[in-house]
Amino acid sequence: MMRAMITGITSQDGSYLAEHLLSKEYEVCGFVHGKANPRVDRVRRLLPDVRLVHGDLLDLSSVLSAVEQVQPDELYNLAAISHVPTSWEHAELTGEVTGLGVLRVLEAIRVYSGIGGSRTPTRGQIRFYQASSSEMFGDVRESPQTEQTPFHPRTPYGSAKVYGHLLTQNYRESYGMFAVSGIMFNHESPRRSPEFLSRKVTLGAAKIKLGRERQLRLGRLSARRDWGFAGDYVRSMQLMLAQDEPQDYVVGTGVTHSVEELVDQAFRVVELDWHEHVICDTSFIRPIEVNQLCADPTKARRELGWRPKVGFDELIEMMVDSDLALLSTESSA
């Protein structure tokens, strides 16, 4: 039985990835920080078959200890401070977790595996997946973006992701490690945290439909993103580690939608006119805005056989329906 270790298992992607690996009869271990973390309790309820190990990405010895306990065949590093506005508010911590955290995981794998100058592991090779991000492209010079598109990040989060991405390449080339990065474009789900734009919109539409709120305040509606379903995207992670050779891949739908289109679809689901409820508030606009990101997933389609199954409209409907059910359950409790 294959054994996988997931950092960031309390996240949207972590839970979907764990479910996917369990369906393939993996043994799954989650690396979590803080025994009193309420998100850990949620993981225990959602994923009772997942074993949890405690540690801290800010401490190399802690990461190494977890790797020694779990002895994984595959390690998926999904941990990050991924909310862009939060990365501005806590830029140093973002660098420590999202950037240097990758270094500590790679070093833990290298030390545990006994990889040195010979580039040959003495204890078996751990295959490593790094969750890179389309935010690394930032102020794009070409569209759509491929694996060769230059990086020009415009946020602390994007900059930290570039550091982790390049480190993964460095360890692959310098030590012969099976280390890959998936450059993931925006992917959402009902499990997305409410502070993220997509969930803010779907939750807002649901609250307005149920009479909980009257207005939804948002920033620029013209910004465009390549949005997909998180449950689809985690399949690509496992496929990357199943290849004969380690390579990086862009993962996305190849189709962009504006924030206005997202809003329109969410309010269509609840049969309301968004123009009557949405207010554009300049205070929500980022210090430096990323205008348009669009994936070219040709390589992933060709080499991994990966394609998204859930379309944009279906995704937004899924999220709104989930939020309506959640709010209705809360009101009846």
Predicted segment positions?
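N-terminal Rossmann-like NAD(P)+-binding domain of SDR-like oxidoreductases, especially those catalyzing
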Residues: M1-H187, V310, S322-A325, S332
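C-terminal substrate-binding subdomain of Rossmann-fold SDR/epimerase-dehydratase oxidoreductases
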Residues: S23, G30-F31, G55-L58, R192-S193, ...
